[in-house]
């Protein structure tokens, strides 16, 4: 991986330095004119014990995405409605995203899908909330194809209407598992490459869950991206496919802020496009993530696997943010491999660095917000919340 003077690491296709620097310039030029979407989605895959660190148990994972969205918008607040779930280690990456979005004066748009309740904060309504979470992928019937197509069409329409570059982020407990299922449905052997919010990825559990889902899906030879999402995917993937394609049709650059979940969306789009305009499509699409997620090189290998399969040149950028100097265990846990990414932490912190903010400034603000959220009782202390 190549590192710039800002400490930003590139991964994936690193064919020439000029292209890398052009990507940096695109980002820097658009920091103040960027539409940030946080897509919060529910899948009952998250209810499998041990599948996710986005909440200490299945019950707490039901409100994780809502709490993440609330914290992204409001930060530490006495009037908070949703408690952030207690984690085995670390703290929600929404902390990083909140701090950095405030630094760059960004106002994220929240898109709830399959959450089951109406958030009190401003949000974009794209489907009936009574639809609820998608089914567990083990059923092989995550959603109806009608729902998938509706989410795709809504995302497409929003994307095509955009007049500025886009950053797509997510909070989807269980979403890394549905991402892996989608990639394996298209023949990619990625079980050792897909990461996890957990310190140790539950690889064997995931293999069993995904194997069962793929068997129950009964795919046909002509099954397409929509069939795959309907079988083993989640609402985030369906909507983001449309949003990504729509934004590119509107000639807007797109930052996918995350890891394997964003790569699953890219794969779904590449399968859908086939050979049509894929090079033009991918040129101004790139992955942005945290340095913690690229530490072991698995994400780099995963990006290159997609590059090879689809003959594209997808490039990734990793934020230089680190918590080595922090005095708090919850932040230092990131350096040990806990949590790693989520809620757009990589992409939004990367933008803060490109806007001139220093690591120590971001760390200091994260510490202040952590102190406040703990003081206000914003993190649940219940292990069975």
Curated annotation (Swiss-Prot):
This is UPF0284 protein P9301_04631. Belongs to the UPF0284 family. NCBIfam families: nicotinate mononucleotide-dependent phosphoribosyltransferase CobT (TIGR00303), PRK04447.1-2 (NF003369). Gene3D superfamilies: 3.40.50.10210. GO terms for molecular function: nicotinate-nucleotide-dimethylbenzimidazole phosphoribosyltransferase activity. It comes from the Bacteria. It comes from Prochlorococcus marinus (strain MIT 9301). InterPro entries: Nict_dMeBzImd_PRibTrfase, Nict_dMeBzImd_PRibTrfase_arc, Nict_dMeBzImd_PRibTrfase_sf.
């Amino acid at each position: 991986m190549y590192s710039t003077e800002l400490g930003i690491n590139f991964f994936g296709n690193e064919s020439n330095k000029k292209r890398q620097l052009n990507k940096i310039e695109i980002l820097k030029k658009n920091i103040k004119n960027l539409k940030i979407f946080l897509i919060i989605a529910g899948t009952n895959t998250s209810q499998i014990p041990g599948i996710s660190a986005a909440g200490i148990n299945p019950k707490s994972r039901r409100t994780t995405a809502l709490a993440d969205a609330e914290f992204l918008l409001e930060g530490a607040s006495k009037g908070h409605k949703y408690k952030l779930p207690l984690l085995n280690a670390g703290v929600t990456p929404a902390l990083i995203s909140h701090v950095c979005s405030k630094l760059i004066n960004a106002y994220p748009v929240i898109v709830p899908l399959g959450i089951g309740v109406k958030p009190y904060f401003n949000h974009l309504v794209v489907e009936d909330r009574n639809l609820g979470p998608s089914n567990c992928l083990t059923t092989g019937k995550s959603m109806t194809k009608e729902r998938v197509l509706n989410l795709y069409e809504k995302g497409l329409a929003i994307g095509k209407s955009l007049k500025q570059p886009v950053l797509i982020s997510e909070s989807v407990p269980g979403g890394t598992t549905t991402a892996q299922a989608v990639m394996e449905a298209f023949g990619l052997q990625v079980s050792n490459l897909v990461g996890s919010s957990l310190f140790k990825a539950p690889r064997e559990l995931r293999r069993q869950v995904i194997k069962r889902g793929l068997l129950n899906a009964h795919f046909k030879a002509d099954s397409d991206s929509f069939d795959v999402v309907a079988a083993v995917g989640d609402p985030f993937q369906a909507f983001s496919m449309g949003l990504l394609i729509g934004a590119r049709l509107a000639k807007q650059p797109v930052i996918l802020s995350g890891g394997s979940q964003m790569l699953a969306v890219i794969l779904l789009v590449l399968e859908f496009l086939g050979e049509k305009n894929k090079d033009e499509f991918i040129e101004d699409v790139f992955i942005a993530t945290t340095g913690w997620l690229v530490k072991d090189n698995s994400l780099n290998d995963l990006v290159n696997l997609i590059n090879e399969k689809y003959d594209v040149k997808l490039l990734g950028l990793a934020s230089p943010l680190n918590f080595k100097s922090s005095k708090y265990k919850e932040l230092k846990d990131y350096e040990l491999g806990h949590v790693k990414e989520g809620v757009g932490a990589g992409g939004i912190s990367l933008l803060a660095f490109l806007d001139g903010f220093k690591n120590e400034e971001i760390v200091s603000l994260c510490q202040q917000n952590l102190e406040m959220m703990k003081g206000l009782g914003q993190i649940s202390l219940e292990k069975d919340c």
